[in-house]
Amino acid sequence: MQHPPCEPGNCLSLKEKKITEGSGGVCWGGETDASNPAPALTACCAAEREANVEQGLAGRLLLCNYERRVVRRCKIAGRGRAPLGTRPLDVSSFKLKEEGRPPCLKINK
């Protein structure tokens, strides 16, 4: 059984073509394979999903920068806005008078 090459869009077409049969095999466009269908293609799809997640995160970060006019790496979630990787201790110890306002930090007064 030959599987399609690892290219963008193949995982979606793969999901559309996959039909489970009553015998326990999986039908791939007319072929039946009772074993695990395509480990290499499954790994390819996992890599494609990870790339889509990273691309989505990058898109959100740029959106945050564009719409909110804040520094890159700003996370929009929850109540406050702080750069990714900022610990609460780092934020609370920031000196506002000497160093200015920290980027992406929403201060509730």
Curated annotation (Swiss-Prot):
Tissues where this protein is expressed: Expressed in the neuronal cells of the cerebrum and cerebellum, spermatocytes of the testis, pancreatic cells and also the heart. Expressed in both primary and metastatic neuroblastomas and in thyroid tumors (at protein level). Expression is associated with poor prognosis in neuroblastoma. Expressed in the fetal brain, lung, liver and kidney at varying low levels.
Primary location class: cytoplasm
Protein's gene: MYCNOS
UniProt KW keywords: Cytoplasm, Nucleus
Subcellular location: Cytoplasm; Nucleus
UniProt organism field: Homo sapiens (Human)
Protein name per the record: N-cym protein
Tree of life domain: Eukaryota
GO CC terms in record: cytoplasm; nucleus
Subunit relationships: Interacts with MYCN and GSK3B.
